[in-house]
Amino acid sequence: LDADHLCLTVKKVDQGLVSSWLVEKSQVGDILRLGQPYGDMQQSIQTPKLLLLAAGSGITPMLSLIESLSQTKQLNKTPVQLMYWVKTHQDAAYTDYLKEIAENFPNFSYQIFYTQEQDQRLNQNHVETLGALNEITVYACGPSGFASTAESLFAEAAVLQTEAFSLSQFSAEQTDIGFINVTLTKSNKTVAIPKGQSILSSLEQQGIKPNHGCRMGICNKCACTKAQ
């Protein structure tokens, strides 16, 4: 791939509208409109080692990083270790690619763990095999529980960046009632938002149509800046 082409990794999920269409019905010549890419995981590594932690679909940004590091030859000088968790052997993606990268770049190594077949989940034992955390940049991506575990286990890393593709469970206190006033900086309009309701839903009820995508706060398309 080059700067003019994108590679999309799509896993079909049960009753998934977009993934089912892409896997079953999309054809050569279809025109798709994509938003701007988003993410804080960059390839400029300032520590002696980079550790990538991926669970499930969290492998996708890691693949992009690995490919970029290989193209820029940074893999020739920076040791990169990937630890990848999936449910079963069948769920592991891009294993041939990872094997090829490991064969071509001695600084790259990877391990795949199977949570359903062998119950190998991220834990303290994995941390103890890595040496001094203050010399490692750690990137982690996966479900919210996986990301939270990584944040706890690798809190002493020189750099720690996590991304989650599912939301943590949250329940508002039943006694937490009332409204919060939110003032929009562009229109200077003030909107009363019920506690426990998302800003996006409240704005839509007021006839305002902000940009949005997943409606869960994951894709960041509806992200906005808090002025104060």
Identify the residue ranges that each predicted region occupies:
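Short, surface-exposed secondary-structure boundary micro-motifs
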Residues: 37-38, 227
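Structural motif
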Residues: 49-51, 81, 137
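Short, Lys/Arg- and Gly-enriched loop/turn segments at beta-strand edges
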Residues: 39-46, 52
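Ferredoxin-reductase
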Residues: 1-31, 35, 48-49, 86-89, ...
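Short, glycine-rich nucleotide/cofactor-binding loops
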Residues: 50-60
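Reductase modules of NAD(P)H-dependent flavoproteins
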Residues: 88-228
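Short internal beta-strands
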Residues: 9-10, 76-87, 111-114, 161
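Histidine-anchored nucleotide/phosphate-binding helix
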Residues: 59-73
